[in-house]
């Protein structure tokens, strides 16, 4: 079927991709502007089948409680907590939106998507223990990190983390920053609930439909070309606003849109693999998200973690990540993704990163060369008695790190997310990876503020119902923080008192 004969339909909003970002934006728009029509196109046959799938996530529930890359050490030995506070502030916004969703019926059964799990930072060696003590000293007095503990006694370590203690040589000092109030989030389950609400309230979701092109019209609207991957039928959709929440596929579509704001951006794909525990007895001996410290010179994405996941109400355990490399921008993408993303406007950025990120290149080479025995040996830093027969290697989702123009360098690699939008607010997209899904709500509120400045003011009362702290830094208003924390904990059923230590089985 030719494009000329394609069926044409009209909609107010097109969401590209059925992942957590599109689902969040759609759920917000259905509440603040219920008269707008919303159409979602997903190239695969299921919701959240790429990066939002729980086994494809590199990490979940990111709130900077345990991730050491958010708390770098200064030259004088002190620890900078700026990034950690910023990430935690964003996660509090997401928690509030989810709690409001449960209260209002947008979401149901919070246990299906969020569960209390301690977040733990783990190091060994005297110098690293000293750093972790300095990190604790910097964070423990901050209202968003209240309740954090510093643990360096072997007997307490053993009580809380029995799987990690068995066979460990405690003559090498160990230290933990332990936060009881952490969470595990199944973003696949959450995405399904949010998109279920969008569909039930009048939105339309098309699976097996791939957006192939975006063309701006003189009236400011967009012609969106879509192909049904099952039968090859093409259709044309006219939309007043387009959000490209296509994960690794977002860069290509933003490039096709031709907007000036997307020029100069590139993407560097990194695939991830994890060891997933297959022994229920071992899974029952560990209930925590334990994050270590990346090796000197290794990128932030390489931070090792032994991670409890709760998926379908069942506990799971994984360790990683082990980096891999593929030119695909999506797990189910194409090998031409990377080469076809190189354009005249981002060529210098891409080449600049090739020169400036030699450390990343070396890291990837070493990871690709690692044997199965080498992976188990790495795991033994966390689980000294680990045996290969108890673990299986799984491939996680593709992460496409943002490459951005930089004066004098050509381009720099950024380990975060970036909202890209046209100046007229008719199209926006999200690029990048970590912290990703955990900050979906503040990211989508940012999209609304950028793209709908006139409507945003009239939407504010409704948005403040969803997020009571909207526009307020909770760090600066401890009374409000206490109020929303108690509220979200109750509504989301996050009773951490029942999680006495990591040896308690789920």
From Swiss-Prot:
Residues in coiled coil: none
EC annotation from Swiss-Prot or TrEMBL: 1.1.5.4
Pathway(s): Carbohydrate metabolism; tricarboxylic acid cycle; oxaloacetate from (S)-malate (quinone route): step 1/1
InterPro entries cross-referenced by the UniProt entry: FAD/NAD-bd_sf, MQO
A molecular-function term among this protein's GO annotations: 2-hydroxyglutarate dehydrogenase activity
Domain of life: Bacteria
Keywords: FAD, Flavoprotein, Oxidoreductase, Tricarboxylic acid cycle
Known cofactor(s): FAD
Protein name, entry field: Probable malate:quinone oxidoreductase
The species this protein was found in: Rhodococcus jostii (strain RHA1)
Upper lineage: Bacteria, Bacillati, Actinomycetota, Actinomycetes, Mycobacteriales
